[in-house]
Amino acid sequence: MKKIINILTFIFIILLYHLTKNSNTFLLTFSFSLFLIYYSIFSSNKITKLLNDYYDKKYLYTMNKVFKCSILLIIILTMLLGVISYIISTLINIEKLYLVNITMTIFLSISLIIKLINNYLNIFEYKKNILLNIYKLSSILFNIINIFLLYKVFLSEDYLKIIIIYLVPIILGIILIILSYILVVKKNNKYTKKREETKINYIMQIKKSLIDNRCIIIYNIINASYIYISIIVLYYILLNRYKYSYDDVSNYITNTYFYGIIIIYIIHLIIKKIYNTDINKLKTSIINKDNNYKDLFHKKLNKIINTSLTITIILMIISGPINITLFNNDYNFIFGLVPLIFFYTIYDSIVNINIICNKEKNIIIFLLISLITKIIFEVPLINSAYRMGYTAYFGSIASTILGLIISIIIGIILLTRKLKINLLDNFNSILNIIYENIILCLILTLFTLIIKVDTKNIISSILVIIFYIFITIIYYIIKRIIIPKNNQ
């Protein structure tokens, strides 16, 4: 079911682009990037774990109280975030943004409550994730119909269209919350009325469960902040310094930091799925203090670097055809974002390993240093890119990459000190990976002289994508035959 939902979400994003191509959806980009920051605040799974613990102990009354207090906390916090959203909208001074942002915070509240109720139902062994799956599927399907009607049939103000896009999952969520309460939660309440003898401070327990996971929460907030900061800075520089029109700035930022970033993030998730098992094995090895964890660290790091670098190179070559295939757009806004895949993948891996073996304070400090680095260099790099004749977002991406590099360097230093690993032991292997990928890059670049990548129609773009992926596969098959496995 999860795969079906992911595929439908991807289809929805592509349809959204094509149906709104001639409209201004900048308010959706702005509000959704803020939504990602807010959602990160609630990214801890500790409350669900707390509910499970009480259920295992047969503390059903306490579990029920924690569940209700958690819902109340979500409502209070999202109301507070709604106020913050209003203040942000006033400061940014974009017309009707405050209405969109407030609607977005209501959507956030409903989504979080649905997720919590879903986890609550899972504890009582109802069909796993049934509520969440119904909510996601219905929201996607109804919104596909909704955006078609909004942008092709009923013509209205741009901000109203964005509000209605958020209202669809809000209304569906409210209906599902009411139904789940009537059919399930209310029924379970009769089993949870008997108070346990042990008195528990529910609010403190919930607070503790959130604080225990603060490193991951801060990590997620900082990741989302990279995008939001880029959007705000680009908006002000292009509009005020370089005198772009509002519509041009809106389309420019939406293409880059909404559709482009979504595609890059999907690719990152695919790469992460390739090496996720390896990272988990490494984490287990470090926690158990196995003798071979140093060799395992080098091996897994090599795999991550090799996989991410190869995919980055191939995507740099075929980003144009991918852009034509998905968006049928002559302006290739994916190309400049591709380097993020390599740096973000390594950054994500290094941070995740640090989380299990280093002090929380140290991790938070180096994450903040990377974000501050991005903020400091954002404006100078955007201006430099513009003056050199490149698109302005190249400078914005460069500042993000610089921040990620700082994080990677500090993170590796912390790991080498904590785990007593000498990176020089692995230096030759990393050099070999770089050489192999340089050769791949040269081969693919030479092929571009024969098979052009600047195609203008979808069918030829798909054929070009298949061809270059095939060449990459052939390259690695030949490499495996020529180079013995133990020397790779």
Model-derived features: positions:
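Specific pore-lining/lateral-gate transmembrane helices of multi-pass inner-membrane transport
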Residues: 53-70, 256-342, 346, 357
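Short membrane-interface helical motifs at transmembrane helix boundaries
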Residues: 79-98, 312-329, 380-386, 450
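Membrane-interface helix-loop junctions in multi-pass transport and translocation proteins
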Residues: 130, 140-179, 183, 361, ...
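Transmembrane helical elements of multi-pass membrane transporters/channels
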Residues: 1-17, 21, 172, 184, ...
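Interhelical loop/hinge segments that connect adjacent transmembrane helices in multipass membrane
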Residues: 159, 181-223, 417-434
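Membrane-interface junctions at transmembrane-helix termini in multi-pass inner-membrane proteins
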Residues: 110-135, 339-367, 390
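Transmembrane alpha-helical segments of multi-pass transport proteins
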Residues: 221-225, 232, 428-485
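Alpha-helical transmembrane segments of multi-pass membrane proteins
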Residues: 94-118, 257, 329-350
